[in-house]
Protein backbone atom coordinates (compact mmCIF):
# COMPACT_ATOMS: atom_id res chain seq x y z
CA UNK A 1 0.00 0.00 0.00
CA UNK A 2 1.14 3.55 -0.63
CA UNK A 3 2.67 5.44 2.27
CA UNK A 4 1.34 8.83 3.33
CA UNK A 5 3.65 11.83 3.20
CA UNK A 6 1.70 13.57 5.95
CA UNK A 7 2.79 13.59 9.58
CA UNK A 8 0.56 13.00 12.59
CA UNK A 9 0.18 15.49 15.42
CA UNK A 10 2.63 14.94 18.30
CA UNK A 11 1.29 12.25 20.61
CA UNK A 12 0.62 13.17 24.26
CA UNK A 13 3.11 10.59 25.59
CA UNK A 14 5.91 12.54 23.88
CA UNK A 15 5.27 15.70 25.94
CA UNK A 16 7.01 14.48 29.15
CA UNK A 17 10.02 13.31 27.12
CA UNK A 18 10.24 16.68 25.37
CA UNK A 19 10.08 18.56 28.66
CA UNK A 20 12.76 16.31 30.17
CA UNK A 21 15.10 16.78 27.22
CA UNK A 22 14.65 20.55 27.22
CA UNK A 23 15.92 20.62 30.80
CA UNK A 24 19.04 18.60 29.99
CA UNK A 25 22.46 19.84 28.97
CA UNK A 26 24.59 18.43 26.19
CA UNK A 27 25.17 19.11 22.52
CA UNK A 28 24.47 15.60 21.18
CA UNK A 29 21.51 13.35 21.91
CA UNK A 30 20.58 9.90 20.65
CA UNK A 31 16.81 9.33 20.66
CA UNK A 32 16.22 5.60 20.37
CA UNK A 33 13.47 3.03 20.50
CA UNK A 34 11.45 0.78 18.19
CA UNK A 35 9.85 2.29 15.11
CA UNK A 36 6.44 3.86 15.37
CA UNK A 37 6.80 5.35 18.86
CA UNK A 38 7.44 8.91 17.65
CA UNK A 39 11.22 9.40 17.60
CA UNK A 40 11.14 11.54 14.45
CA UNK A 41 8.28 13.66 15.79
CA UNK A 42 9.99 14.11 19.17
CA UNK A 43 13.30 15.08 17.54
CA UNK A 44 11.65 17.65 15.29
CA UNK A 45 9.78 19.16 18.24
CA UNK A 46 13.03 19.32 20.22
CA UNK A 47 14.83 21.00 17.31
CA UNK A 48 11.91 23.41 16.96
CA UNK A 49 12.13 24.31 20.66
CA UNK A 50 15.91 24.81 20.53
CA UNK A 51 15.53 27.18 17.59
CA UNK A 52 12.36 28.93 18.79
CA UNK A 53 12.63 32.66 19.50
CA UNK A 54 10.02 32.50 22.29
CA UNK A 55 10.27 29.01 23.84
CA UNK A 56 8.52 27.88 27.02
CA UNK A 57 9.16 24.99 29.39
CA UNK A 58 6.79 22.90 27.26
CA UNK A 59 8.55 23.59 23.96
CA UNK A 60 8.34 25.89 20.95
CA UNK A 61 5.81 28.69 20.72
CA UNK A 62 4.63 27.57 17.28
CA UNK A 63 4.11 31.04 15.83
CA UNK A 64 7.44 32.93 15.77
CA UNK A 65 9.46 33.39 12.58
CA UNK A 66 11.67 30.42 13.47
CA UNK A 67 8.73 28.06 14.04
CA UNK A 68 7.07 29.18 10.82
CA UNK A 69 10.24 28.63 8.81
CA UNK A 70 10.50 25.06 10.14
CA UNK A 71 6.90 24.46 9.07
CA UNK A 72 7.88 25.73 5.61
CA UNK A 73 11.05 23.55 5.57
CA UNK A 74 13.23 26.65 5.05
CA UNK A 75 15.00 27.25 8.39
CA UNK A 76 18.60 28.27 7.68
CA UNK A 77 19.90 26.91 11.01
CA UNK A 78 18.33 23.45 10.77
CA UNK A 79 19.97 20.70 8.70
CA UNK A 80 18.48 17.25 8.24
CA UNK A 81 20.48 14.19 7.26
CA UNK A 82 18.07 11.58 5.95
CA UNK A 83 17.87 9.10 3.10
CA UNK A 84 16.71 11.01 0.03
CA UNK A 85 13.64 8.78 -0.25
CA UNK A 86 12.51 9.88 3.21
CA UNK A 87 13.45 13.52 2.60
CA UNK A 88 11.10 13.50 -0.38
CA UNK A 89 8.37 11.60 1.49
CA UNK A 90 8.44 14.15 4.32
CA UNK A 91 8.69 17.15 1.95
CA UNK A 92 12.18 18.28 3.00
CA UNK A 93 14.22 19.91 0.20
CA UNK A 94 17.24 18.08 -1.16
CA UNK A 95 20.58 19.72 -1.82
CA UNK A 96 20.48 21.44 -5.21
CA UNK A 97 23.04 19.07 -6.75
CA UNK A 98 21.24 15.95 -5.51
CA UNK A 99 17.88 17.23 -6.73
CA UNK A 100 19.33 17.93 -10.17
CA UNK A 101 20.84 14.44 -10.44
CA UNK A 102 17.50 12.87 -9.56
CA UNK A 103 15.47 15.18 -11.83
CA UNK A 104 17.76 14.40 -14.76
CA UNK A 105 17.44 10.65 -14.07
CA UNK A 106 21.17 10.30 -13.42
CA UNK A 107 20.27 8.19 -10.39
CA UNK A 108 17.38 7.27 -8.11
CA UNK A 109 16.85 8.81 -4.66
CA UNK A 110 19.09 7.08 -2.15
CA UNK A 111 17.69 4.84 0.57
CA UNK A 112 20.79 5.47 2.66
CA UNK A 113 22.25 8.70 4.08
CA UNK A 114 24.82 9.70 1.48
CA UNK A 115 28.37 10.68 2.39
CA UNK A 116 28.00 13.81 0.22
CA UNK A 117 25.15 14.95 2.46
CA UNK A 118 27.32 14.33 5.54
CA UNK A 119 30.11 16.45 4.09
CA UNK A 120 27.64 19.24 3.32
CA UNK A 121 26.46 19.03 6.93
CA UNK A 122 30.01 19.42 8.24
CA UNK A 123 30.37 22.56 6.11
CA UNK A 124 26.99 23.78 7.42
CA UNK A 125 28.23 23.61 11.03
CA UNK A 126 31.21 25.79 10.15
CA UNK A 127 29.15 28.73 8.87
CA UNK A 128 27.73 31.51 11.02
CA UNK A 129 24.19 30.90 12.25
CA UNK A 130 21.49 33.07 10.72
CA UNK A 131 20.63 34.91 13.93
CA UNK A 132 19.00 32.42 16.27
CA UNK A 133 20.33 30.80 19.42
CA UNK A 134 21.64 27.58 17.92
CA UNK A 135 22.27 25.51 14.84
CA UNK A 136 20.69 22.05 14.86
CA UNK A 137 21.57 18.90 12.92
CA UNK A 138 18.99 16.10 12.93
CA UNK A 139 20.00 12.66 11.60
CA UNK A 140 17.18 10.17 10.94
CA UNK A 141 17.27 7.21 10.85
CA UNK A 142 20.85 7.33 12.09
CA UNK A 143 21.34 3.62 11.37
CA UNK A 144 21.05 4.44 7.65
CA UNK A 145 24.62 5.81 7.72
CA UNK A 146 27.29 3.42 6.50
CA UNK A 147 30.73 3.40 8.15
CA UNK A 148 32.15 5.98 5.75
CA UNK A 149 29.28 8.41 6.32
CA UNK A 150 29.36 7.86 10.09
CA UNK A 151 33.10 8.48 10.26
CA UNK A 152 32.64 11.67 8.21
CA UNK A 153 30.56 13.24 10.98
CA UNK A 154 32.49 11.80 13.94
CA UNK A 155 34.89 14.67 14.63
CA UNK A 156 32.18 17.31 14.18
CA UNK A 157 29.87 15.36 16.49
CA UNK A 158 32.56 15.25 19.18
CA UNK A 159 33.62 18.90 18.89
CA UNK A 160 30.91 20.87 17.06
CA UNK A 161 31.76 24.43 16.02
CA UNK A 162 29.91 27.19 17.85
CA UNK A 163 26.60 26.33 19.46
CA UNK A 164 25.62 23.44 17.19
CA UNK A 165 23.44 20.69 18.61
CA UNK A 166 23.00 17.19 17.23
CA UNK A 167 20.00 14.88 17.32
CA UNK A 168 20.66 11.31 16.21
CA UNK A 169 17.35 9.52 15.87
CA UNK A 170 17.38 5.75 15.62
CA UNK A 171 14.97 2.84 15.43
CA UNK A 172 17.86 0.35 15.64
CA UNK A 173 20.52 1.96 17.82
CA UNK A 174 22.44 -1.31 18.13
CA UNK A 175 23.44 -0.89 14.48
CA UNK A 176 25.22 2.42 15.13
CA UNK A 177 28.98 2.57 15.47
CA UNK A 178 29.99 2.43 19.15
CA UNK A 179 32.06 5.57 18.55
CA UNK A 180 28.86 7.42 17.57
CA UNK A 181 26.86 6.15 20.53
CA UNK A 182 29.63 7.02 22.97
CA UNK A 183 29.56 10.67 21.91
CA UNK A 184 25.85 11.09 22.60
CA UNK A 185 23.63 11.18 25.62
CA UNK A 186 20.80 8.70 25.14
CA UNK A 187 17.06 8.97 25.67
CA UNK A 188 15.04 5.82 24.97
CA UNK A 189 11.34 6.16 24.26
CA UNK A 190 9.06 3.94 26.30
CA UNK A 191 6.01 2.13 24.98
CA UNK A 192 2.74 4.00 25.55
CA UNK A 193 -0.16 2.20 27.19
CA UNK A 194 -2.83 0.88 24.84
CA UNK A 195 -5.60 3.21 26.07
CA UNK A 196 -3.86 6.54 25.30
CA UNK A 197 -2.51 5.08 22.05
CA UNK A 198 -6.03 4.18 20.93
CA UNK A 199 -7.38 7.55 22.04
CA UNK A 200 -4.67 9.33 20.05
CA UNK A 201 -5.34 7.23 16.93
CA UNK A 202 -9.03 8.13 17.05
CA UNK A 203 -8.14 11.81 17.59
CA UNK A 204 -6.05 11.61 14.40
CA UNK A 205 -9.02 10.45 12.36
CA UNK A 206 -8.65 6.66 12.56
CA UNK A 207 -12.07 5.02 12.72
CA UNK A 208 -12.79 3.64 16.21
CA UNK A 209 -13.72 0.30 14.61
CA UNK A 210 -10.26 0.12 12.99
CA UNK A 211 -8.04 1.52 15.74
CA UNK A 212 -7.54 -1.58 17.93
CA UNK A 213 -7.01 -3.93 14.99
CA UNK A 214 -4.49 -1.60 13.33
CA UNK A 215 -2.65 -1.02 16.62
CA UNK A 216 -2.30 -4.79 17.00
CA UNK A 217 -1.28 -5.07 13.33
CA UNK A 218 1.49 -2.55 14.01
CA UNK A 219 2.72 -4.50 17.01
CA UNK A 220 1.55 -1.77 19.40
CA UNK A 221 3.39 1.04 17.59
CA UNK A 222 0.91 3.94 17.36
CA UNK A 223 2.56 5.94 14.56
CA UNK A 224 2.88 2.79 12.44
CA UNK A 225 -0.81 2.08 13.04
CA UNK A 226 -1.61 5.66 11.99
CA UNK A 227 0.45 5.19 8.81
CA UNK A 228 -1.49 2.00 8.03
CA UNK A 229 -4.76 3.89 8.37
CA UNK A 230 -3.44 6.71 6.19
CA UNK A 231 -2.59 4.18 3.48
CA UNK A 232 -6.24 3.13 3.38
CA UNK A 233 -5.97 -0.16 5.28
CA UNK A 234 -9.18 -1.19 7.04
CA UNK A 235 -9.59 -3.63 9.91
CA UNK A 236 -11.71 -5.97 7.80
CA UNK A 237 -9.02 -6.15 5.11
CA UNK A 238 -6.30 -6.93 7.65
CA UNK A 239 -8.33 -9.62 9.41
CA UNK A 240 -9.09 -11.38 6.12
CA UNK A 241 -5.44 -11.63 5.03
CA UNK A 242 -4.18 -14.79 6.81
CA UNK A 243 -6.87 -17.11 5.48
CA UNK A 244 -6.76 -15.49 2.04
CA UNK A 245 -3.02 -16.19 1.92
CA UNK A 246 -3.62 -19.77 3.05
CA UNK A 247 -5.94 -20.15 0.05
CA UNK A 248 -3.20 -18.84 -2.23
CA UNK A 249 -4.98 -15.58 -3.12
CA UNK A 250 -2.19 -13.28 -4.29
CA UNK A 251 -4.80 -10.64 -5.15
CA UNK A 252 -5.23 -9.96 -1.42
CA UNK A 253 -1.67 -8.58 -1.27
CA UNK A 254 -1.34 -6.85 -4.62
CA UNK A 255 -1.70 -3.35 -3.09
CA UNK A 256 1.53 -3.79 -1.13
CA UNK A 257 5.14 -3.46 -2.28
CA UNK A 258 7.25 -6.66 -2.15
CA UNK A 259 8.95 -5.44 1.05
CA UNK A 260 5.57 -4.78 2.65
CA UNK A 261 4.30 -8.19 1.54
CA UNK A 262 7.26 -9.90 3.20
CA UNK A 263 6.61 -7.93 6.41
CA UNK A 264 2.91 -8.93 6.41
CA UNK A 265 3.75 -12.58 5.78
CA UNK A 266 6.31 -12.51 8.60
CA UNK A 267 3.56 -11.33 10.95
CA UNK A 268 1.22 -14.11 9.80
CA UNK A 269 4.02 -16.66 10.18
CA UNK A 270 4.93 -15.38 13.66
CA UNK A 271 1.35 -15.60 14.90
CA UNK A 272 0.82 -19.07 13.44
CA UNK A 273 3.99 -20.21 15.21
CA UNK A 274 2.66 -18.77 18.46
CA UNK A 275 -0.61 -20.67 18.08
CA UNK A 276 1.30 -23.85 17.26
CA UNK A 277 3.06 -23.76 20.63
CA UNK A 278 -0.01 -22.66 22.58
CA UNK A 279 0.94 -18.98 22.94
CA UNK A 280 -1.11 -15.88 22.17
CA UNK A 281 -0.71 -14.26 18.73
CA UNK A 282 0.48 -10.66 18.53
CA UNK A 283 -0.61 -9.15 15.22
CA UNK A 284 -3.92 -10.94 14.50
CA UNK A 285 -6.70 -12.28 16.71
CA UNK A 286 -6.60 -16.08 16.90
CA UNK A 287 -9.88 -16.63 14.97
CA UNK A 288 -8.40 -14.83 11.94
CA UNK A 289 -5.51 -17.29 11.64
CA UNK A 290 -5.41 -20.62 9.79
CA UNK A 291 -4.62 -23.51 12.12
CA UNK A 292 -3.09 -26.93 11.75
CA UNK A 293 0.22 -26.20 10.03
CA UNK A 294 3.10 -28.15 11.65
CA UNK A 295 5.67 -26.10 13.52
CA UNK A 296 8.49 -27.47 11.34
CA UNK A 297 6.83 -26.11 8.19
CA UNK A 298 6.25 -22.73 9.83
CA UNK A 299 9.85 -22.57 11.02
CA UNK A 300 11.14 -23.26 7.51
CA UNK A 301 8.75 -20.63 6.13
CA UNK A 302 10.11 -18.11 8.62
CA UNK A 303 13.65 -18.81 7.40
CA UNK A 304 12.55 -18.47 3.77
CA UNK A 305 10.94 -15.09 4.53
CA UNK A 306 14.15 -13.83 6.10
CA UNK A 307 15.94 -14.73 2.89
CA UNK A 308 13.26 -13.01 0.78
CA UNK A 309 13.54 -9.85 2.88
CA UNK A 310 17.10 -9.34 1.63
CA UNK A 311 15.94 -8.89 -1.97
CA UNK A 312 12.45 -7.45 -1.45
CA UNK A 313 13.55 -3.82 -1.82
CA UNK A 314 14.89 -4.48 -5.33
CA UNK A 315 13.01 -7.44 -6.82
CA UNK A 316 13.78 -8.53 -10.37
CA UNK A 317 10.03 -8.78 -11.04
CA UNK A 318 7.58 -7.63 -8.35
CA UNK A 319 4.64 -9.60 -9.77
CA UNK A 320 6.56 -12.86 -9.95
CA UNK A 321 7.94 -12.31 -6.45
CA UNK A 322 4.41 -11.81 -5.09
CA UNK A 323 3.20 -15.03 -6.72
CA UNK A 324 6.19 -16.93 -5.36
CA UNK A 325 5.74 -15.55 -1.84
CA UNK A 326 2.04 -16.43 -1.74
CA UNK A 327 2.69 -19.90 -3.15
CA UNK A 328 5.35 -20.42 -0.48
CA UNK A 329 2.94 -19.22 2.23
CA UNK A 330 0.14 -21.47 0.99
CA UNK A 331 2.47 -24.45 1.04
CA UNK A 332 3.54 -23.80 4.63
CA UNK A 333 0.05 -23.07 5.94
CA UNK A 334 -1.49 -26.14 4.27
CA UNK A 335 1.35 -28.53 5.12
CA UNK A 336 0.41 -31.77 6.88
CA UNK A 337 2.00 -33.39 9.91
Regions found by a protein language model. Give the residues of each.
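Clamp-loader machinery-focused feature within the broader ASCE/P-loop NTPase space
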Residues: 2-148
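Loop/turn-to-beta-strand initiation segments
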Residues: 131-136, 161-167
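Charged, glycine-rich active-site and insertion segments that engage polyanionic ligands
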Residues: 1-49, 55-58, 65-66, 162-165, ...
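Residues immediately C-terminal
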Residues: 144-145, 159, 175
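Conserved adenine-binding aromatic site and its adjacent loop/helix in ATP-hydrolyzing domains
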Residues: 123, 155, 182
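Conserved catalytic/switch belt of AAA+ P-loop NTPases
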Residues: 126, 151-165
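Short N-terminal helix/helix-N-cap motif within the alpha/beta-hydrolase-1
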Residues: 147-150, 334
Amino acid sequence: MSESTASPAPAPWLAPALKTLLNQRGHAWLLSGPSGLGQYTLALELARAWLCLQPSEEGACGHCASCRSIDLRTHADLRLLMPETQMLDKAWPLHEKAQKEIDEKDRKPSREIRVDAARDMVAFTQTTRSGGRHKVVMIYPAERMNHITANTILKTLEEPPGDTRFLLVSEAAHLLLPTLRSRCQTHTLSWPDAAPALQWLVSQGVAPTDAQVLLDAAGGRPEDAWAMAQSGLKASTWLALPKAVARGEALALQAWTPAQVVAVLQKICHDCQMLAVGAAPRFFPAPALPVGAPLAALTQWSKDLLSSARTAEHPFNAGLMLEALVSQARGALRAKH
